[in-house]
Amino acid sequence: MWPQVIPGSKSITNRALILAALAAGPSTIHGVLRSRDTDLMADALRSMGVTITEEAPDRYHVEPPAELSSGSIDCGLAGTVMRFVPPVAAFADGPVHFDGDEQARIRPMTSILDALRTLGVRVENNRLPFTVTSDGIPEGGVVEIDASASSQFVSGLLLSAPRFVNGVTVRHIGGRLPSMPHIEMTVAMLREVGIRVDVTPNQWTVHPGEIRGHTWRIEPDLSNATPFLAAAAVTRGTVTVRNWPRDTTQPGDSIRSILEDMGCTVEFISNGATFDLEVTGPAELKGIHLDMSDIGELTPTVAALAALATTESRLTGIAHLRGHETNRLEALTAEINRLGGNCTELDDGLHITPAPLHGGVWHSYADHRMATAGAIIGLVIKDVGVEDIQTTSKTFPGFETLWEEMVG
C-alpha cells in the first residue's frame, strides 16, 4: 500500500487568488499549489499591484491594493490566467497587456473578450496578445456568451462580477456546457466570501457587493491524484491518497465511481479528523461507457485505463477537449495507436477497443495530462518512454519523484 499527500487544487488555488485580489481586505490561503499555472496567476495579480507574500511554501498572504494598476501579464499556457484575469483588468487604472506561450495564442478567447466589450470594457484583439482598458468602474449588466468551448468563460466573468456597479448576469446561449462542476465551484467560493449568486439553468446572476477577505484552506487536487489511483487499477495494487474530501465541488472526485465501475475496490478510510481514499485494483480491469462532459479533464487518465482494460470503452461528451493545451482527442488516439492500441476518434469522444500494447515513445505534446496518461500505461507495458515528463510541472511539480517513489 502506498500512501501519498497530493498538493493543493489548482482550480481552487487560482480562484482563491482572484477573489483575494478583489477583496476589501487581506486574505490568507493555506495549502496553495505551487506550479507553473498558479505561479503565473500570482505573478499576473502582482503585476496589477496586488501584494502576495509567501509566508510558507504552501501559504500566501494577499493584500489587495486600493486600486489595481496597469501592467503586462504573461499567461503562459494557463487557461485560468487567460480567462479569469481579463475581467479583473477591467478595474485597473490603465491598460493591461496580455500575452502567453505560442500554443496559448490559438486557444479560444473570443467569448470572454466579447463579453467584456458588452459590459463596457475596451479590448484590442480577439486572441493573445490583447489589451484590456477600462474607463472607470464598468457598469456590468447582462451578457450572453457561448461557453461551450470552456466553462472558464463563465467562471472568469462570475469571479469579478461583484465589483461591477450593477453586478453581472451571464447567460450561456451555446451548445452543451462542459465542466459544470467547475462553475459550481466558482459559485460556492463566491458565496463563501459573502456574495449573493442566483442560479437558474444556463444563467448566473452575481449581485454587486463587497468581497470579504477570507482564510482559504485548499483541498488536495483530486484530478492530479487520479494517475496514482489509476496506477492501483492497472497493477492490481493498492494506493491510498491522504485527506480526500468527503464533500467537494472538484470534478476529480468522479474518479471514485469510475474506478468502481471498472472493477476496483474504492473505500474511505477514517484518519482522525480527515479521510483517506484507498483504491485496490481488480484481477480484470473492465472497460467503461461514460459521458465525460462534466469531467473532461479526467479523459487522459480514463483513456489510459481504457487502453489497458479487457473490454471496450466509449468516452463521450468531450468534443471541447480539442481546444485544450493540445487537441487531446487527436493526441490520445495517436499515442494509444502508436503503442499498438485500437483507439478511434469520435465526433465527441473516443472509442477504445482492447488490443495488445507494446513499448515505444509516448509523446506529451507539452500537455501535463497527456504525460501522466503515458506514465500510467508505462507501469504495465514494458519499454514505454514518456517524452517530456517534466511538462507535468504545469500543475504538479515533483510528479516524477512521487511516481518513482510509488513504483519503488
Curated annotation (Swiss-Prot):
Fetch the NCBIfam families from UniProt. Answer: aroA (TIGR01356)
Asked if the Swiss-Prot or TrEMBL record annotates the protein with the keyword Transport, the reply is no
Gene3D superfamilies given in the database record: Enolpyruvate transferase domain (3.65.10.10)
What name does the UniProt record give this protein?
3-phosphoshikimate 1-carboxyvinyltransferase
Could you list the residue ranges forming a coiled coil in this record?
none
Sites binding 3-phosphoshikimate sit at: 10-11, 15, 150-152, 179, 297, 324
Q: How does it assemble?
A: Monomer.
Which one Pfam family would you cite for this protein? EPSP_synthase
- Top-rank taxon of the source lineage equals Bacteria
A biological-process GO annotation: amino acid biosynthetic process
List of catalytic residues: 297 (proton acceptor)
Identify the keywords attached in UniProt to this record, alphabetized: Amino-acid biosynthesis, Aromatic amino acid biosynthesis, Cytoplasm, Transferase
Q: Provide the protein's localization.
A: Cytoplasm
Indicate yes or no for the key word Translocase.
Answer: no
Q: Which InterPro entries match?
A: Enolpyruvate_Tfrase_dom, Enolpyruvate_Tfrase_sf, EPSP_synthase, EPSP_synthase_CS, RNA3'P_cycl/enolpyr_Trfase_a/b
Q: Which family does it belong to?
A: Belongs to the EPSP synthase family.
Q: Name one GO cellular component term.
A: cytoplasm
